């Protein structure tokens, strides 16, 4: 029975365990109250999982610097790795400074459609950068372990209702407030929810293109549309049971197959 190690290489080495699954990503792998990794560990019959990254990590951060160095290190040191999981991109198109400053027009108050709320050439430009970051990560995996299966995922349709963590700014509602997106029907319906759905759908197309053009075996875990509105803990994260549902219904099958489990 293996354990989960979050950015703790010394503890991994002291344990004497080898790594079966390598994960790199954002809060969907690191969120303290539950995440995808914890229930995935159980669904895969408790392999050793090493997790790189942190809450708030962007795709364009994970593909360089110390995160990338650690990815290379783990792939080189542990030939037993049979699966790589990536969770990235959400922080590139959510949050103050990204959603409002890069994607949404400065004043959407008169908008009646999603397209009317976007800046020129966006969000295509943002997703082009996200796709490039994924391709960079996959190229690193391919250079060291071209045989390893890689799983990526497309999150789900979050609710822009302003719920966040204590001391953390809203990721969706506040940027939409800044851009004066109409509030009719919000937060569960209306233009604001349509923007979230459109961004997730465009992100899915981005990942689909990455999957279809990568020399590495990549599978898109389709989780968008799985969660009920009551299964969100806040604007970006499912409840503990919501994360478990996504693992059981979406992740478990392809991940077990990658590890040779029935």
Language model features by range: what are they?
Residues 30-32, 92-96, 158-164, 228-231:
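Short catalytic/ligand-binding loop motif for oxyanion handling, primarily in non-cytosolic enzymes
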Residues 110-131, 137, 189-196:
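Surface-exposed cleft-lining segments at the edges of enzyme active sites
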Residues 126-177:
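Hydrophobic, aromatic-enriched interface-forming segments
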Residues 231-262:
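Histidine-centered active-site loop/cap adjacent to the catalytic His
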Residues 20-22, 28-125:
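Conserved SGNH/GDSL esterase-like catalytic core that processes O-acyl groups on lipids
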Residues 1-19:
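Short N-terminal or domain-adjacent regulatory/targeting segments
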Residues 53-54, 217-233:
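Acidic carboxylate-rich catalytic motifs and surrounding loops in phosphoryl-/glycosyl-chemistry enzymes
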Residues 161-219:
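Substrate-gating cap/lid alpha-helix
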